[in-house]
Regions:
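Nucleotide-state-sensitive switch-loop elements of NTP-binding domains
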Residues: 1-7, 12-139, 145-151
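Conserved C-terminal guanine-recognition region of P-loop GTPase G domains, centered on the G4
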Residues: 94, 99, 103-104, 114-116, ...
Length: 321
């Protein structure tokens, strides 16, 4: 059996990706039995995909908050502790779901199809309490690997529109990716999800953010200058048009662009960037030193992007059959 742990911050598109991956494999690789496992007890009541194994049958974050009178973080820790005691239930349900999916593939193929190894997609919770405050996720990973002989890969999603918003947010995304990589100790793939939400200009500029390991040498200072230029321009417009109701005169745009170009040349990053620039630069030097971070763009509606990501995952886990 092979599988992927779909993780990332809340709102990064994990659940949407899981459903998109299931639909993609059902069309382009119908001989691969796919089992979906939801491990997030805080997922919404109306689930966007048919879930083979759902941890909410064991514990629900909302019910824990109501019955135990705990806050959100305390409820997550309570859920994690209960999930750890029900590892056997999860393994049993996964085994039953695998048997069902294998039968479905054989029946659909008329009995003449040789199924590929089962494939497990795990929708992981995004809250940090499940990783730093509890051993439940690591216990489950080891149980899947040992008891089901499941070869796993971490697919770490971050929102492209958020991560490429500014340099400091991008640095945070890189640190989060490295932390997850070290914590899971599994083959690892980083993904910029929601790539389709970027504008054409942002999408072209976003190509630079995909290459984290070469970001320092090629794009760091250039993008910092661009960020500072945009900040200065916004401040200037705020002074000229304080109410926001006035429109920038089109005749002013060429002179504004020329002034922006002059400002780029005049920007002293050490002085104008301040402590944030120096701190971000120091952190990115650490990221660059690892030489392990890069991102794949993903639009779940794009066949090419889904195919490329699926091939990368299969290469990581050795799923070549």
């Amino acid at each position: 059996m092979f599988g992927e742990l779909v993780c990332g911050p809340p709102g990064s598109g994990k659940t949407t990706y899981c459903e998109g991956k299931r639909q993609f494999l059902s069309v382009y690789e119908p001989t691969r039995p796919v089992v979906l496992l939801n491990l997030d007890p805080a997922n919404e009541d109306i689930f966007p995909y048919p879930c083979d194994v759902d941890i909410r049958e064991v514990v629900s974050h909302v019910r824990v908050m109501e019955t135990e009178e705990l806050g959100p973080n305390g409820s997550y820790l309570f859920c994690a502790a209960l999930m750890e005691r029900r590892i056997d239930w999860i393994i049993q349900k996964v085994e039953e779901a695998v048997d069902r999916r294998l039968r479905d593939v054989v029946i659909t193929g008329g009995g003449s199809v040789h199924p590929r190894p089962p494939y497990l997609i795990i929708d992981c919770p995004g809250q940090v309490e499940f990783y730093l405050g509890s051993p439940v996720m690591h216990t489950l990973f080891r149980a899947l690997q040992k008891r089901l002989c499941c070869t796993l890969c971490t697919v770490h999603l971050v929102d492209a529109s958020v991560s490429t918003r500014d340099i400091s947010t991008y640095v945070s995304s890189c640190l989060l990716s490295i932390t997850t990589m070290i914590d899971h100790e599994l083959p690892h793939i980083n993904v910029f999800s929601k790539w389709d939400t970027l504008s054409v200009e942002d999408s072209e500029e976003g190509e630079a953010y995909l290459r984290a390991s070469s970001f320092m040498a090629e794009d760091f200072d250039r993008l910092w200058k661009k960020q500072l230029r945009q900040r200065r321009r916004n401040q200037r417009l705020a002074k000229l048009y304080p109410t926001g109701a006035e429109k920038l005169d089109a005749r002013d745009e060429p002179s504004a662009a020329a002034r922006d170009d002059m400002e780029v040349e005049a920007i002293d990053l050490e002085k104008d960037g301040g402590h944030l620039y120096r701190y971000s630069k120091a952190v990115m030097e650490v990221v660059d030193g690892y030489g392990l971070i890069g991102f794949l763009p993903l639009d779940v509606q794009s066949q090419d992007m889904m195919t490329r990501l699926t091939q990368q995952i299969d290469d990581c886990i050795g799923n070549f059959l």
